[in-house]
Each structure stands twice: as C-alpha cells, then as structure tokens.
C-alpha cells in the first residue's frame, strides 16, 4: 500500500467514525426519551435523520459544518490553515483521479460531496437497522460494543472504497470518449443515444404485447368453449320443453327461454315453433273471451225476458235511473211474496183454472174473508183490537175448496153480473184515490236493475186487490231491492 492510498483510507475512516458516532450514540439517546418501545423508536430516529439530510437543505448544511469541525479536531489541523472550501476539496479529491480533480470547479465539488454523503448515510442507516445489527445496538450495548462498532467501521470503509472505484471508472470512460468537435455532432450524439433508449423501450413493449395477445387468445378459446357448452345446454332444455308441451307446466319454461339472448338460438326452427306457440296461445285467449261474452249476453237475455206462460199486464210503474243524491227507499215487495205469487199461478195453471174464472170467483166471494172487509170492520168498530182480528182469521172455516170453486164456476148463474158491475165501479173509485195519493212520490232510478232484472209491477185486479206479476226468470239473482211505485 503506497502513501496515497493510506491517506485516502485515513480520510474514509474519519468519515465513518463521525457518522457511526451519530447513529450509535446520538440517535440512541434520542430514542430513550420516548415512551414507545426503544427498538421502534430507534428505527424512527434513523429514518428521520436520513430523510432530513436528504430533503432539508439547512439540516444538511448544519451536519456538514459539524463534520468540518470534527475533521479538524481529529486531524489536528488548524481551521485557519484548512478552511471550509479546502475541506470540501480534500474529501472530494480522495474519490477522484488527480488529473480531473484540478479541472473541476468548487461548485461541482460541493454537489459531488452532497451526493456522496447522502448516499453513504442512507446505506449505513439501512445496514444498522437490519435484523442482524439492530438487537446488538439496542440491547446489551456494553457487551457488544467492540463487535458492533468494528462491523460498522468495516461496512463504512468498504462502501466508501467501492464508491471511489465507481467514480474512477466513470471518469476513465469519459476520458476514452472523444469529445465532439461541433455542436451539431454533440446534438446528434445526444439524439442517437435517446433514440437507442426509445428502441429499447419499444422492444420491451412489443414483448409485453405478445404476452398479452397470447393470454387473450387462451381466454378467447376458453370463452368459445364455454359458450358452445352453454348453447348445447340451452338446446337440451328447449327440447325437453317441446316434449312436455302438452302439459300446462311447460308454459313458464317457454317464457324463460324467450327471455334468453337471441344469439344462443340461431336455429330457425325454434323461432318458427315459438311464433306458432304464441299464435295458439293468443287464439285460445280470444276463444275464451268470446265464450265469456256469449255467456253474459245469454244471462242478460234470460233475466230480461219473462216466461211465456205468464202474461205481463201493463203497469203504471216507471223505473228510471236514480240520481246520485237520492237515497233509494225500500221495496214494498220481497222475494218471499214473489215466490208465493209464482207458486199460486203455477198451481192454478196445473189444476186448470183460468185467470178470468179466478177473478170472477174473487168478486163473488163473501166480503168477510177479504182484507178490505177487515179494514172496513176496523173502521166502523175502533174498539175491536188486532187480537180479535187474528182470532177471527184463525176461526174461519176453509169452506172454499178448489173443488167447490170448480163447481161454482160451472153452476154460476147470470144474476151475479150486476154485483160484478157494482164491484167494478168501487174498484175504479179506489184506483182514482190511489193515483192521487201516489202522484207526490218520486220516481226512483236504479242503474243496477236495468241489466239484471226488472222490478215487480203491481196492478189492481177487478176485485180491488193488488195482483202480482213479474218479469223475473225463475232464478233469483239478488237480495232485497228498493223501489218506489207511482
């Protein structure tokens, strides 16, 4: 080892001693003041110091000034003879060849020193915080002091020597390179180097593109395979639906098939069969609707027409649609009265009685068995109560049988005609009175009765009683019906 190399190694060892002292002692003391774990806090301190020197210019200048003072004390050189610029030149010249160190300006040397120190500090901090070194620095410091400091000094010296060799090689390559004579050649050389870098990037991108295309082709093959499998399964499902098309449960499945994308059904037969199924369904729906309409019309015709056996007399009752504000009064007749009247008429027709004979017989009967006679009797004798009337009706004998009515109709004499005419005059008088009483009653309109059934129409027979006639069919379609008769 010559004298020059020994001088360089002494400078590198001085640099290593200063920064090892900072990492081993100064940052460890700062970590002890925190309440967190010492290991974690020591790591935070090391990282903070490295980032501060790199990023904060003031902290870097402060660190460099303290290092300058330390260097003067260690080398025992007076600060007057070794100023700050000479200190920077001494450190940087130890990394560069002599032929180049004299030609470099002081500003460039400052920038070179900054790069060297920042790189050195970051690498030394990374080495200290490894799992191999960190436990020995934080724990059992007295026992492991010599061992740890020796390893740190060896790492520092080897790193600085390696860095010196790299800088030497850079300057040697620069010396071998022939400098361009003109600016045009210099720009050409710069652009050619930039072009080479672009070509290298293009090669990398093309290789990546090839790899991506290969992956895309494999994925496309997988997709086509799965798509064909999916189409096959859908076709099988469609065939199964066609086999069970006669059952009603197949209808939701056909709807499910129709919701699937059309690209899976390239078969034209499926499209034709699907359209035919839709036509059949629409035809069935139309037929059902026509049947319903025919049933409704038939029911309306049945309810609107009366039986042919029962002639309907002309009624004085006018049934119109009621206004929205008018309350509908209750009817004077009920379903029971209507059924009783129908049963009576059927019984008379079965036994051979005509309506004319029944009317004449009702005119010739004794007035004591009529409702009008009971009313006149009650008017003449108001002291007789309803109980006596009920007893009188219960005690009366069934003297008028159907056989007696037949014999009476056959054997009746012409002298009864005068009494019949008198009774007709009485009936005409009563009809006039009833017409005057019913003129003030409102005509009720009910829209619910027009389409379903016609109301009961009451007329007076020749004997002065109400005779019930109806346009009802034999089927009763409603409950109580509310009407007003004028």
Swiss-Prot record:
The organism's place on the tree of life at top rank: Viruses
| Membrane disposition | Single-pass membrane protein
Ribosomal protein listed as a keyword: no
Recount the UniProt induction comment for this entry: Expressed in the late phase of the viral replicative cycle.
| Record localization | Host membrane
Ranges that cross the membrane: 7-28
**The keyword Transmembrane helix belongs to this UniProt entry's keyword annotation:** yes
What broad class describes the main subcellular location of this protein?
A: host cell
- Keywords noted in UniProt: Coiled coil, Glycoprotein, Host membrane, Late protein, Membrane, Transmembrane, Transmembrane helix
Q: Where is the signal peptide?
A: none
Entry GO terms, CC: host cell membrane; membrane
* Sequence segments annotated as region (Disordered): 299-329
Per the record, the similarity remark reads:
Belongs to the asfivirus B475L family.
What's this protein's name? Uncharacterized protein B475L
Which source organism? African swine fever virus (isolate Tick/Malawi/Lil 20-1/1983) (ASFV)
């Amino acid at each position: 080892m010559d004298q020059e190399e020994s001088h360089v190694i002494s400078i590198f060892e001085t640099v290593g001693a200063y920064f090892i002292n900072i990492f081993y002692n100064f940052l460890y003391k700062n970590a002890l003041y925190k309440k967190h774990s010492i290991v974690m806090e020591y790591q935070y301190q090391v990282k903070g110091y490295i980032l501060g020197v790199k990023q904060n210019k003031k902290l870097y200048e402060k660190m460099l000034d303290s290092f300058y003072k330390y260097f003067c004390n260690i080398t025992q050189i007076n600060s007057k003879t070794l100023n700050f610029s000479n200190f920077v030149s001494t450190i940087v010249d130890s990394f560069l060849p002599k032929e180049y160190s004299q030609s470099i300006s002081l500003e460039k040397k400052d920038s070179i020193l900054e790069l060297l120190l920042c790189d050195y500090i970051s690498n030394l901090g990374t080495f200290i915080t490894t799992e191999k070194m960190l436990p020995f620095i934080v724990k059992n410091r007295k026992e492991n002091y010599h061992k740890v400091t020796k390893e740190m000094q060896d790492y520092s010296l080897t790193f600085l020597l390696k860095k010196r060799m790299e800088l030497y090689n850079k300057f040697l390559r620069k010396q071998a390179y022939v400098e361009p004579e003109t600016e045009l050649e210099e720009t050409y050389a710069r652009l050619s180097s930039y072009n080479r870098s672009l070509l290298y990037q293009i090669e990398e991108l093309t290789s990546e593109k090839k790899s991506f295309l290969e992956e895309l082709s494999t994925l496309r093959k997988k997709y086509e395979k799965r798509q064909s499998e999916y189409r096959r399964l859908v076709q099988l499902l469609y065939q199964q639906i066609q086999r069970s098309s006669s059952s009603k449960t197949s209808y939701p499945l056909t709807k499910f098939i129709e919701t699937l994308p059309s690209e899976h059904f390239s078969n034209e037969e499926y499209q034709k069969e699907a359209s035919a199924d839709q036509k059949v369904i629409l035809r069935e729906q139309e037929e059902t609707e026509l049947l319903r309409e025919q049933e409704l019309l038939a029911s309306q015709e049945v309810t609107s027409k009366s039986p042919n056996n029962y002639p309907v007399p002309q009624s004085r009752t006018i049934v119109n649609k009621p206004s929205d504000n008018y309350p509908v009064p209750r009817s004077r007749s009920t379903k029971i009265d209507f059924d009783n009247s129908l049963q009576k008429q059927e019984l008379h027709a079965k036994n051979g009685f005509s309506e004319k004979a029944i009317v004449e017989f009702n005119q010739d009967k004794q007035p004591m068995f009529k409702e009008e006679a009971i009313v006149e009797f009650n008017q003449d004798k108001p002291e007789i109560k309803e109980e006596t009337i009920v007893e009188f009706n219960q005690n009366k004998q069934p003297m008028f049988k159907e056989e007696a009515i037949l014999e009476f109709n056959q054997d009746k004499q012409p002298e009864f005609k005068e009494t019949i005419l008198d009774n007709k005059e009485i009936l005409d008088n009563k009809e006039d009175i009833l017409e005057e009483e019913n003129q003030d009653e409102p005509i009720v309109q009910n829209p619910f009765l027009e389409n379903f059934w016609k109301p009961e129409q009451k007329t007076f027979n020749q004997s002065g009683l109400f005779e019930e006639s109806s346009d009802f069919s034999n089927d009763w379609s409603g409950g109580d019906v509310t009407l007003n008769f004028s």
